[in-house]
């Protein structure tokens, strides 16, 4: 029995794959992980990798070994699903387990996103006006990723200035949640602009970002 996948597209722009893996395949991956551990094990009286499997396996942490096995199996199952549904993910997936009991089928969700569909207005305009009239749904996952990058960069800059992030928040009169919301809004706004530029560049067959900006600056 092979693994299967189902694709859903939530309104937030993300992609969600439901990955279903039969126990037989999980067991096979687990057995391979055990064999790997046996090959790397060293017991008194035996050369490395030569100790019998029945002596090594009882000493293994089953949950740890199973996690190791899934670490090899899930990327394969995910890659197959991406190919099956002809997806072009922008980000590595966020994988969560839905159900997983020994002897039963295991189910996971893998959440990722593609570049959003951009619908430009019939008449192109200067960038600020163009962005306001462009229809595009930026995936939540992409906004979150960009906001996290900005937060990490901010934290690094604040540390360089000899402050803690808490001190920075106090000076700006912001809570941590307000800062995250602010960065997310900025990230969303910038992503809308960038994807709008990319669509104009593609539509007008312009060579690069600078040429696209120059083209839009000439428009009224």
Please provide the spans of the model-predicted regions.
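Short small/polar-residue motifs
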Residues: 1-6, 90-94
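Extended, charged alpha-helical "arm"/coiled-coil substrate-binding scaffolds
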Residues: 2-73, 113, 122-220
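Extended, domain-scale alpha-helical bundle/helix-rich regions
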Residues: 73-74, 81-114
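Short alpha-helical functional segments enriched in proximate histidine and acidic residues
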Residues: 80-81, 194
């Amino acid at each position: 029995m092979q693994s299967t996948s189902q694709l859903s597209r939530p309104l937030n722009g993300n992609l969600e794959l439901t990955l279903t893996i039969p126990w037989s395949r999980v067991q096979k991956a687990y057995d391979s992980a055990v064999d790997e551990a046996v090959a790397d094990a060293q017991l008194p009286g035996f050369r490395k990798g030569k100790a019998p499997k029945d002596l090594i396996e009882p000493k293994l942490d089953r949950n740890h070994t199973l996690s190791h096995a899934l670490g090899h199996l899930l990327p394969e199952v995910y890659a197959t699903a991406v190919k099956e549904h002809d997806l072009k993910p922008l980000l590595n997936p966020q994988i969560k387990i839905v159900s997983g009991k020994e002897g039963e089928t295991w189910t996971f969700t893998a959440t990722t996103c593609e570049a959003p569909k951009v619908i430009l207005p019939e008449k192109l305009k200067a960038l600020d006006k163009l962005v306001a009239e462009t229809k595009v749904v930026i995936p939540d996952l992409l906004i979150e990723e960009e906001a996290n990058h900005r937060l990490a960069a901010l934290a690094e800059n604040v540390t360089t200035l000899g402050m803690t992030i808490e001190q920075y928040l106090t000076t700006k009169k912001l809570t941590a949640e307000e800062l995250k919301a602010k960065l997310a809004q900025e990230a969303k706004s910038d992503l809308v602009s960038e994807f709008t530029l990319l669509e104009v560049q593609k539509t007008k067959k312009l060579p690069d970002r600078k040429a696209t900006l120059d083209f839009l600056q000439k428009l009224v």
